[in-house]
Regions:
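Intrinsic disorder/low-complexity segments enriched in polar/small residues
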Residues: 58, 63-64, 117-119
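N-terminal helix-turn-helix DNA-binding core of bacterial DNA-binding proteins
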Residues: 14, 18-58, 78, 82-91
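Hydrophobic side chains within alpha-helical segments
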Residues: 35, 65-66
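Amphipathic alpha-helical dimerization/coiled-coil segments
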Residues: 1-15, 19, 90-120
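Alpha-helical residues within the helix-turn-helix
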Residues: 51, 62, 68-69
Length: 120
């Protein structure tokens, strides 16, 4: 697969599957999902995230460390503070698709309109 192309999902190596699973674990914590969602609107500092999300600043910092380690967010120093943002549009798309899928299920829609099972 080249960057930007469609991956061949049938041919995931064990290493790729492990890496994808680690990335998807970021979405297993509601606090991290909320942080990613907020950063999807625009970059901001730890203090801003803490205030806007109603979280303790140390908790936000801890979650940002996890998200940085997974390559989902980046930080840039601005004077005495770090400003965080999404790594790239892939992260925004991943979160958007997860939210869309969850909402789809919540509404009880069995199959997305136009969706078809793909033959093996």
């Amino acid at each position: 697969m080249t960057h930007g192309g469609e991956p061949d999902l049938a041919l995931l190596s064990a290493e790729t599957a492990r890496s994808v699973a680690e990335t998807m674990q970021a979405l297993a914590a509601p606090s991290r999902v909320r942080i990613l969602s907020r950063l999807g609107v625009g970059a901001c500092s730890v203090g801003e995230l803490a205030r806007e999300l109603g979280m303790a600043q140390p908790a936000v910092s801890q979650q940002l460390r996890v998200l940085r380690h997974l390559g989902l967010v980046v930080g840039e120093r601005d004077g005495r503070q770090m400003i965080y943002g999404l790594h790239d549009d892939h992260v925004r798309s991943l979160l958007s698709e997860a939210v869309s899928h969850t909402e789809h299920l919540r509404l009880g829609l069995a199959v997305h309109p136009g969706a078809q099972l793909q033959p093996a």
